[in-house]
């Protein structure tokens, strides 16, 4: 189920917009919407979304450095690897597909590879390469989630893993234990206790986060989980599973207070990570890197009530079909590089994300780092990976 569509329905009930705005910066490179072969046979253009300044998002610089290292390693080859940072990668893909072509290589967004590109045979099938090189463990969840009738058209180097984070100091002050995450009733009771403290603290950041409540509640049943992992349909909206999840989320949000609702969690993120005024934040494992040093000992990871996690291979690296043999070979080598243990360890320790490679020992890396936030990242990843219910969002 598309979380933005769920959010739209929540808007109607709660009177708050929950659709995050999206950027409008276009590609800085000329010819960004030309066919992949127009750049010349000796250049492999790679569009990615890590355009942010290091001061804005340090992880973006880490990813660019990883890309640049690959380019330097292959600088003497017949094909030049050219990473291009853009904010409008999905627009570039859509424009090229509409014209019957596909970028040489692109890290597609959460929407994945457009079906129109697949139906036109514009995208390279990565599965034979993965199988021939025994990369099943290296690509991890991609191998099953991105399987389309025996074909794999994208591999994401990170797993988008979501649970929640809670402030143990606030919980202790309100007399709450981790039993609060047993189910959504105990969760609601816990949020009421936080509200009853009578100070500036409140339960959780609602709005965008409320869509995750709906999805997590639905994922607690097999029928609901199947609906979440499919397109939103009229039958889904009219189902008992959706009605129960929607009503529960609406009730929780109303009790939590409309002033604590936002269309983008980022607008109130500092309330949790820096100011310590919020009991719970629905966010991915990557939130570990945003916790202020003064709160790092108090903030802990947990799963959604009912031992539910949301995890997705997301979009990922996709390669154009019918390129030259040399360009295709370099593109495949890049995918092997990005899913290698060495790079995946950097993605965990420096990007602070859940790596796709299942052979990476996250706990060992965290202990070696000696960094509390990294250790909590490892704990969050481990919880998601071992959840009773893992739903694809």
Predicted regions and their residues:
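Extracytoplasmic/periplasmic substrate-recognition and gating elements
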Residues: 72-73, 293-354
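Glycine-centered hinge/linker elements that transmit conformational signals in sensory
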Residues: 189-193, 232-262
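A ligand-binding cleft/hinge motif common to bilobed small-molecule-binding domains
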Residues: 114-117, 285-297
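Extracytoplasmic/periplasmic solute-binding protein
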Residues: 151-157, 162, 185-234, 278
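Hinge/lid segment of periplasmic solute-binding proteins
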Residues: 85, 109-161, 185-189, 300-302, ...
